[in-house]
UniProtKB/Swiss-Prot annotation:
Molecular functions per Gene Ontology: hexosyltransferase activity; UDP-glycosyltransferase activity
Leader sequence segment: none
Coiled-coil ranges per UniProt: none
Family classification: To M.leprae L518_C2_147 and M.tuberculosis Rv1524.
CDD domains found in the cross-reference section: GT1_Gtf-like (cd03784)
Source organism of this protein record: Mycobacterium tuberculosis (strain CDC 1551 / Oshkosh)
One GO process term, biological-process aspect: lipid glycosylation
Protein's name according to its UniProt entry: Uncharacterized protein MT1577
A Pfam short name: Glyco_transf_28
Length: 426
C-alpha cells in the first residue's frame, strides 16, 4: 500500500510521524512524507522519501515565539487578527498543491497536528481514507491543566471549543480556495469534523497516564498508542560517556526547537545554580552556539543525543516541555522541570505538576533564585520515586510504533466513512 504522511512543525512534530513511516516501510509499504523544507534531511536520514511542505518550521517557531511575547503589548486589533491568520494559513495553497500531487494513487493520507484542512480536502478529492496523529490532547476535553491557572473541566472545554471555532474562522478562506481548486463543493463543516465524519481515526501518540480520565471521556475513535520515537542511534560519543562516568549523574538541560533569547546568560545561570547545588549539568547546545560560549568544568555541552541511552544516566531533566522530551525523560524515570513557552508546552507542564513527577515555570519568568528553588524540589527523593513509578506505566517505544502502524493499515483497508472494526491493543 501507499501511505502519504503530511506533517508540519518542528522536529518534535515530525518525528512521531516519521517513526510510523519507518515501521510501515519495514512492513513493505511505500511511504512518502511531506515535511517542512528544513526537515527533509532529517526524514531522509531515516530512509524515508521527503518532499518540501509549507514554510521553514524553524523560522515559523521563531515567529510564533515573537508573536506570543508581543501579545501583552498594546497593538491595533486589526493588525493582531491579520498576524494570527497569517500564522495559521501560511503556505496553505502551496501545501495543497504539493499534497495533491503526492497523494495520487495513495491508499491513505495522514495529517499531523496542523493544517488538517489541507489533508482532509486531498483525501476527499481522491476519496481515500485519512487519519490524524496527535501528540497532545487537541480535541475538546476537560482533563488538561495549565500551570498557575485554575482549570476546571467546564472552563477547559469552553476554552477549547472557542479555540477550534477561531481556527475554523481564520482558516476558512484558505480552505475554500483549496476546495475550489480541487473542484470540491463548499465544505459543510470544519475540517476536523469532516475527518471525523469520514471515519478518520485520531491516533493519540502519548500515554493516558498523563491525563487521567481522558481515555474514558473520549471514544474509541481516538485510540492511545503511546509516545512515538524513531529511537535514533547516534554515533558513540566516548568523550561524553567518559565525562558522565567521571562524576555524579548530571542534570540534563535541553530546550529543543524553542528559541532561547539569551543563550550566554542562560548557560551562566544554569552553571551558577548547579555549582551552588553541587550538581553537574549536561546541556544541549545547538552547533551555532557551541563554540562561542565558555563554561566551567562541571558543565558539559552536547549536540543531539540519543535520549534512550543518555537520559537514564542523568539525575533529572530540565526542558521546554515538548511532548517527545517529556515522554523520553519520564520513560527514563527522571524527575522533570519544564520551563515552558509556547504551543503545547504549558499542557505538558501542567501534566507533570499534576502527576507530582516534577515542577514547571514559564521560561521567561525564570531567575537564578527560582531555578535554584525548582531544582531543589525535583531533586527531592519523593519526586524521583514518583517519576520512577510513572515510568513503569508508560508504553515502550516498539509497542507504540507497532500499534500506530497497525491502526493505519486497518484504516487504509476501510471504505472512507467507515471505521476499523477493532483497534489494536496497547
Amino acid at each position: 500500500m501507499k501511505f502519504v504522511l503530511a506533517v508540519h512543525g518542528t522536529r518534535g512534530d515530525v518525528e512521531p510521524c516519521a517513526a510510523v513511516g519507518v515501521e510501515l516501510r519495514r512492513r513493505g509499504h511505500a511511504v512518502h512524507m511531506a515535511v517542512p523544507p528544513n526537515l527533509i534531511e532529517f526524514v531522509e536520514s531515516a530512509g524515508l522519501t521527503g518532499v518540501a511542505y509549507g514554510p521553514d518550521s524553524d523560522e515559523q517557531i521563531n515567529t510564533v515565539a515573537a508573536f506570543v511575547r508581543n501579545l501583552t503589548r498594546a497593538q491595533n486589533p486589526l493588525n493582531l487578527a491579520r498576524a494570527v491568520k497569517e500564522l495559521f494559513v501560511e503556505g496553505w495553497a502551496e501545501m495543497g498543491t504539493t499534497l495533491t500531487t503526492l497523494a495520487d494513487g495513495a491508499d491513505l493520507v495522514m495529517t499531523g497536528q496542523t493544517y488538517h484542512g489541507v489533508a482532509a480536502n486531498v483525501a476527499e478529492y481522491y476519496d481515500i481514507p485519512a487519519a490524524a496523529l496527535h501528540h497532545f490532547p487537541m480535541q475538546v476535553n476537560g482533563q488538561i491543566a495549565i500551570p498557575s491557572i485554575p482549570t476546571p473541566a467546564t472552563l477547559v472545554r469552553a476554552t477549547m471549543k472557542v479555540s477550534w471555532r477561531l481556527y475554523a474562522y481564520v482558516s476558512k478562506d484558505a480552505d475554500r480556495a483549496q476546495r475550489r481548486e480541487l473542484g470540491l463543493p463548499p465544505a459543510p463543516a470544519p475540517a476536523v469534523r469532516r475527518l471525523a465524519e469520514r471515519g478518520a481515526p485520531e491516533i493519540q501518540a502519548y500515554d493516558p497516564v498523563f491525563f487521567p480520565g481522558l481515555a474514558a471521556e473520549w471514544s474509541d475513535r481516538r485510540p492511545f498508542v503511546g509516545p512515538l520515537t524513531m529511537e535514533l542511534h547516534s554515533e558513540p560519543n566516548e568523550e561524553l560517556e567518559s565525562w558522565i562516568a567521571a562524576g555524579t549523574p548530571p542534570i540534563y538541560f535541553g530546550f529543543g526547537s524553542t528559541p532561547v533569547q539569551t543563550p550566554v546568560q542562560t548557560l551562566a545561570m544554569i552553571s551558577d545554580v548547579c555549582a551552588q547545588l553541587g550538581e553537574r549539568a549536561l546541556i544541549y547546545s545547538p552547533a551555532a552556539n557551541s563554540t562561542r560560549i565558555r563554561h566551567a568544568d562541571h558543565v558539559k555541552r552536547v549536540g543531539l543525543v540519543n535520549y534512550s541511552t543518555i537520559l537514564p544516566k542523568c539525575r533529572a531533566v530540565v526542558h521546554h516541555g515538548g511532548a517527545g522530551t517529556t515522554a523520553a525523560g519520564l520513560r527514563a524515570g527522571m524527575p522533570t522541570l519544564i520551563l515552558w513557552d509556547v504551543a503545547d508546552q504549558p499542557i505538558w507542564a501542567g501534566a507533570v505538576q499534576r502527576l507530582k513527577v516534577g515542577s514547571a515555570k514559564r521560561f521567561t519568568n525564570i531567575t537564578r533564585g527560582s531555578l535554584l528553588k525548582e531544582l531543589r524540589s525535583i531533586l527531592a527523593p519523593e519526586c524521583a520515586a514518583r517519576a520512577r513509578e510513572i515510568s513503569t506505566r508508560m508504553t515502550r517505544p516498539t509497542a507504540a510504533v507497532t500499534a500506530a502502524a497497525d491502526l493505519l493499515e486497518a484504516t487504509a483497508r476501510q471504505t472512507p466513512g467507515s471505521t476499523p472494526s477493532s483497534s489494536p491493543g496497547r
